[in-house]
Swiss-Prot record:
Gene Ontology cellular component annotations, sorted alphabetically: beta-galactosidase complex
Keyword Ligase part of the UniProt annotation: no
Binding site for Mg(2+) 1: 417, 419, 462
Protein name, as recorded: Beta-galactosidase
Entries under Gene3D superfamilies matching the protein: 2.70.98.10, Galactose-binding domain-like, Glycosidases, Immunoglobulins
Naturally occurring in which organism (per UniProt): Shigella sonnei (strain Ss046)
Biological classification of the source: Bacteria, Pseudomonadati, Pseudomonadota, Gammaproteobacteria, Enterobacterales
Record's catalysed reaction(s): Hydrolysis of terminal non-reducing beta-D-galactose residues in beta-D-galactosides
Amino acid sequence: MIMITDSLAVVLQRRDWENPGVTQLNRLAAHPPFASWRNSEEARTDRPSQQLRSLNGEWRFAWFPAPEAVPESWLECDLPEADTVVVPSNWQMHGYDAPIYTNVTYPITVNPPFVPAENPTGCYSLTFNIDESWLQEGQTRIIFDGVNSAFHLWCNGRWVGYGQDSRLPSEFDLSAFLRAGKNRLAVMVLRWSDGSYLEDQDMWRMSGIFRDVSLLHKPSTQISDFHVATHFNDDFSRAVLEAEVQMYGELRDELRVTVSLWQGETQVASGTAPFGGEIIDERGGYADRVTLRLNVENPALWSAEIPNLYRAVVELHTDDGTLIEAEACDVGFREVRIENGLLLLNGKPLLIRGVNRHEHHPLHGQVMDEQTMVQDILLMKQNNFNAVRCSHYPNHPLWYTLCDRFGLYVVDEANIETHGMVPMNRLTDDPRWLPAMSERVTRMVQRDRNHPSVIIWSLGNESGHGANHDALYRWIKSVDPSRPVQYEGGGADTTATDIICPMYARVDEDQPFPAVPKWSIKKWLSLPGETRPLILCEYAHAMGNSLGGFAKYWQAFRQYPRLQGGFVWDWVDQSLIKYDENGNPWSAYGGDFGDTPNDRQFCMNGLVFADRTPHPALTEAKHQQQFFQFRLSGQTIEVTSEYLFRHSDNELLHWSVALDGKPLASGEMPLDVAPQDKQLIELPELPQPESAGQLWLTVHVVQPNATAWSEAGHISAWQQWRLAENLSVTLPAAPHAIPQLTTSETDFCIELGNKRWQFNRQSGFLSQMWIGAEKQLLTPLRDQFTRAPLDNDIGVSEATRIDPNAWVERWKAAGHYQAEAALLQCTADTLADAVLITTAHAWQHQGKTLFISRKTYRIDGSGQMAITVDVEVASDTPHPARIGLTCQLAQVAERVNWLGLGPQENYPDRLTAACFDRWDLPLSDMYTPYVFPSENGLRCGTRELNYGPHQWRGDFQFNISRYSQQQLMETSHRHLLHAEEGTWLNIDGFHMGIGGDDSWSPSVSAEFQLSAGSYHYQLVWCQK
C-alpha cells in the first residue's frame, strides 16, 4: 500500500491528476463483480448478499471552482455551505457548474497532461455506521463503479487512495481506516484530469460520482479472481467449462475450491480441487491459482436468439466442507471465432443487427438505473436488434448481466478516445501514455470477460493508430484468445483489429481520404490480401430526420456473406431537460447551458428520443433487420428464416388482401420454419376485385404469446406486394351544372353552387376558395421548392463554420429560399363543361431564373379542380429539395385520413417499412417532434387525402401540420414552436431523399436526388 500524508495540501501539491504515469494509488486489482456470499444457495439463486451494502443515497456536497479552494477542514467535518445531493448523480444536473457538449474539440485547452487551473471540484462526504462484525475479521472494501474524472478518497480524515478512468470501478481496502460506530468518507472529485485527454467522446462532459457506491466485506482468505470459459467439440454436442480461480490471503493446505454448474434447479456438473496451478514454465506454476474443468453433455447453447444460461458457483472452503465464501456468475455456453473470413457464433455466421448506445438519461445525465437499461434492451429486441456496441466506454456492470439474460451481443469498448488530438494518435503512439491506456483495456477485460454476451473487445474509438494499440491488442489476444478484437482507428483495417470495422463507409462510393481512405464496403472486401469480415462499427447516422438509404446497406449485407452488418449511430438522443421561467420542461442541446465550445444539436443522433419514444426511422431499421424474409411467386409465399438457432415456435403468419385499403380477404397460419430454412405457404385463390384500385397483399408475422422482451401480439416482420389490378375505365360523367367564370381587372372568379375559386391575375395564384361564406385559404396556393433544413442538409455542427458543399448552403447560395415568382401567364378559358385557368411562373433570384412552373386548373361541373403541374429546373441550379405546392388552410380539423404509405413518417429513401393502406390519425400525430425543428412528417405514395371538408386525389406526397416550413426553419428548439392559424399543407409531386450515410457530407444517393430537369405531376382537389 502506498502511504502519503493525510494532508490535503500534500495531495494538492502532488497533482496526481496531471501525471499520466499515475492512474491510481492503492486501487485494488480488477476482477469480475463480487458479492462474497456466505451461503452457496444464495449465490446460486443470485439473492442479495448480506456482505454487499449500497452507499447510494444522500451525500453532503460542496462545489469549488478549483481543488486549491477546498479548505483543509473539510477532511474532518462537513462545510457549512455543503448541500445534499443524491449519489449516483452528475453534479451538473443539480445546478453546479454546466454540462458541456462537444464532439471532437476538447472542452479544455489542449496541453496534455496538464489541465486548467480552474478545475471544478466536488467535495462529497458521507457518514455511515459499520457492522461491528466486519471490523473483527476480514477485509472491507469500498467500490466506486464510476467517478468522473478523477478522485482522492479519505476515510475518517485519513487518505486512502486515488483513482481515475471514469467508466471502470475503483476499489479500495478500507479495513485499516474503519472504526466502530460512525465513519466518515470524504471524496474529492476533479472535473478535469490527464485522463480527460483519453475521454474525448462525442457526448456531454459531466462530472461526479455517477455510478453506484458500495461496501463489500470479504473474508481474510478470499477468492480474488475467477474466470470462466467454454470449449466444445466439433459439433457442439460436448462442452467443457473451464474455471480458473485465484485466491488471496493465507495459503493453507486445507483450502479447496469447488465449482458447481447449475441449470435452473439441476446441478449439471461439479468439481473440487486444492490450490496449485498448472506448470507454466521451468519455475513451475501459480500456487494461489487452480483450474477446474467440468464436462457437459449436450449443452444448451447461448445466443442472442436463445439466451440459455447456466449458473456457476465458485466456493472457497476447507477440506472438511466449511464454506469461507462463494462467488457466482451466469454462464453461457457459446463459441466465438473468425474462420474463412466470417465471424462465427457456435459455428454459424452472424449478421450483426447492431446499434451504438451512450449511457444517457434526459433527467439524470449519465446515470443509468435498471429500469432504463431494461427499457433500452426491450426496445432493441422488439425492433430486431441483436447487438449493441458500448460506445465508447465500458458500461454499468449491470448492463452486461441484462444483455446475457435477455440476449444481445455486446462489443465492449475501452474508455479511450483522443479525437481532438492532432494527429489523433499523438497520445496513443506515445509510450508515456501506455500505462493509462493499459489500465483502461486490461481492467475492462478482467471485469467483463465472464459475460457470454461480450463477443468482441474494442480498443477504443477515434484515437488514430499507435504503438500502444498494437501492444494492447497483443495483450488481449494472449489473455483472452476466445474473442476477436476490433478497432477502427487508423483506417479500420490495421494490424490491431481482427475485423474490418469502418465507420460511415458507403455501400458503393469510395471516400479516398489522405492516409486513411474509406473504401466502399463492397470494394473493401476485395482489396488484395484482405480476408477479414467487415462489420461497420458505425453507420447510418440517425441524426434528426435521417436513415435514408438504410435499405441499401441491408441489401449488401444479405448479398455478400463477409459483409456481416454493423452498428447504427446511435440509440438515444442526448438531449437534457431544462426548465423555463414557468417551470415547464424543455429539451436542451449543446450551447443551451452557456457551454463553450459546443457542437449544438449534434448530440441528438438517436433512433429514439431521450425519453425513449421512437423516432419514425426506428421502424425502418426494424423492417430491414427483420429475421424473416419473404418472396411472392404466384399464390405461394416463400418465408426464409434468418434465425441461426431458433426454430419458429411462437409465430403466426397473418395475410390480408385489400383494395384501396378496403379488406377483401384474410387468413392466418402458424409458421413452422427451422433456422436458416424456408417454408412455402400456399394462399387460397385470392378474390378478384370488381372495381379498379390498388390491390395489395400484406403479410405480418405475429407472436401470439408474450416473451421475455415482447407482449402478446407483437409484430416482428411484415411485407407488402402490389398485385395485378383491373383496368380503370372512366365512365362519362353525369351531367352537372357548368361552373361560371367572372373576370375582373384583378381576379378570375369561378362559381359553382355554393363553391367559389378566386385566382389573382397579378400573382397568378389560387388566392381564395369559399364553401358558402367560409373562406378556405389563409395563404395562396404556391409552388414550393425548399424544405426546412434537415441536419443532413446542414452538414456541420459547429456554429462558427459553414460548409459550402452542404445542401442547405447550396440552396441558399443559389437563391432557392429567396426566390420570388415572376408571372409569365395567367389566362382563363370557358370549356363546354369546365373552366380552365392556365398559369406560368418563373421563380427567380437576383434576375436569374431557377424554376419555371406551368399549371392548369380545370374546374368542372362536379366541383373538382384538376391541377396539372409542369416544372423545369435550371440546369445550373442545385437539385431542389422538393417540387410541390403549399398553402395555409383555414380549417383545423382533428384528424387526417389518407390512402397511401404509413402510418409513420416516410420519405422516398426511407419507406420500405411503410405500408399502403387507409390511415386515420390525429393531426398532432402528423408532426414529428424532432428537438431541432426541421422538415418532417412526409407521407409518400398517397392516392387520396382527406382533411376537413377537402379531398385531394392523385399520386403525391404530403405533410400537414400547424407549423409552416418557414417557422420550422427559423426555430432552434421544438418547445419554441407555436401553432399557427389554420393548417399548413404541403403536397409534393417529388421530394428529395433525406440521406443518412452520415450527417456531415451530402449523402442522398443519386437516385433520390431531383436531377431530371423537368417534372410533371397532377392531382385533383375537391370537397367531400
